[in-house]
Amino acid sequence: IDRLTSPLPNIQAEVKAGRLGVFWHTQGSGKSYSMVFLTEKILRKVSQNYSFVLVTDRTELDDQISKTYADCGKSSRLSDQVVSGQQLKQKLSAGNQPYIFTMVHKYNQWVKEPYSRRDNIIVISDEAHRSQYGDLANNMRAALPNAKFLGFTGTPLMNSPEDQATKDWFGDYVSIYNFQRAIA
């Protein structure tokens, strides 16, 4: 939240470029709940007009995150979980729906026209260290040119080309809850 509201010029530039940062929370630490708490806090403290597109790269993760939101009473798995690329485009074009759950593979079509030009969309990519680059990710960013992107990962690739790519796409780490902290 601090990055969204920061008056600092360097942080404002990162946010304007769509890079909100990366949450590195170790596996099993409750990243899905962290997403719920974060998105609800943004809606409560910053603006109720944000939409969140929660992107995963596996069906199991998509089901897990949408179920977590539904179990917390924040969404409906039936209406908020996208089943096709066409449905994704329709939901994003339609307006302000708080939560949309999708897989990066739904962005498999070349984007001729953006799905939405809104600047109050935050894309939250789970497992941001993998499958959030290349054609699918480029299509996603073309579909949502004014969106802001936030990455979550439990397995950062420290000091590797992939780690640098994650930072290039999402920005620097904004929260670290590593294994050492988890067991302390």
Would you name each region that the model predicts?
Residues 1-184:
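RecA-like P-loop NTPase motor core of helicase/translocase proteins
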